[in-house]
Regions:
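Non-catalytic cap/lid and distal C-terminal segments of serine-dependent acyl enzymes
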Residues: 3-29, 33-66, 70-213
């Protein structure tokens, strides 16, 4: 319990803002008996999970499975060597897929899926910066086409509520196969990307509509 109480955000040297998920804006802290899923030691990152009863633990990335090494304390770990900022990862314990709340969660491969988000100096375009931020909301509507209740996620720029007479362009974003509408704002960071582009005057303020199709 002492290790859990002493675990602080600043100890990880990683940006919490880009790890936002539906379970909360801040990262989910490890409960008693568990360890953080992603840690940084010096210049190296490690994926890990405590599973003392397991016989095999792997992480899958880019459809390639990487084995973990078991340590004496029952922690399985592997060095995370990929240097892409955002990467889908899948934890398997004894060949059973596990979605861990200790990593951010998105939707990919037609199911809930974990991902890793690192703060990369050459990929700052999706970072949370000190610029005016838009809003992300979920809208609900009844569709006469499907004759069912439907939902979509809508991004509005920072000036949307104030400039009520202004007509904003609308971008409709459609996800790829096996994904759904949450991917654009979860692992995709589209709201932060557009916030930054608007602040840099590289994009005009616009509305983005993201639906599950």
């Amino acid at each position: 319990m002492a290790d859990l109480l002493n675990y602080r955000k600043e100890d990880s040297d990683m940006n919490y803002n880009i790890n936002e998920q539906k379970l909360g804006f801040d990262r989910v802290l490890p409960w008693e008996g568990q360890v953080p899923a992603l840690v940084k030691e010096g210049e190296h990152y490690f994926l890990q999970v405590k599973a003392p009863e397991a016989e095999k633990v792997t992480f899958t990335m880019n459809e390639e499975e990487f084995p973990c090494t078991r340590e004496d304390d029952g922690i399985w770990r592997m060095e995370y060597t990929l240097r892409t900022g955002i990467q889908y990862v899948q934890l398997k314990i004894d060949d059973v897929e596990v979605v861990t709340p200790l990593l951010p969660i998105t939707y990919g491969y037609s199911r809930p899926y974990n991902y890793v988000a690192l703060e990369m100096k050459n990929e700052e375009f999706y970072q949370v910066k000190d610029v005016p931020h838009g809003s992300v909301r979920r809208e609900y509507f009844f569709s006469k086409v499907t004759e069912e209740w439907e939902s979509c996620i809508v991004y509005t720029p920072y000036c949307y509520e104030e400039e009520t007479e202004r007509e904003f362009p609308v971008l409709y974003l459609q996800h790829g196969h096996g994904e759904n509408e949450i991917g654009w704002t979860a692992s995709g960071k589209v709201n932060f990307i557009l916030d930054n582009l608007i602040a840099e005057k590289k994009a005009v303020p616009m509305v983005i509509v993201m639906s599950n199709g």
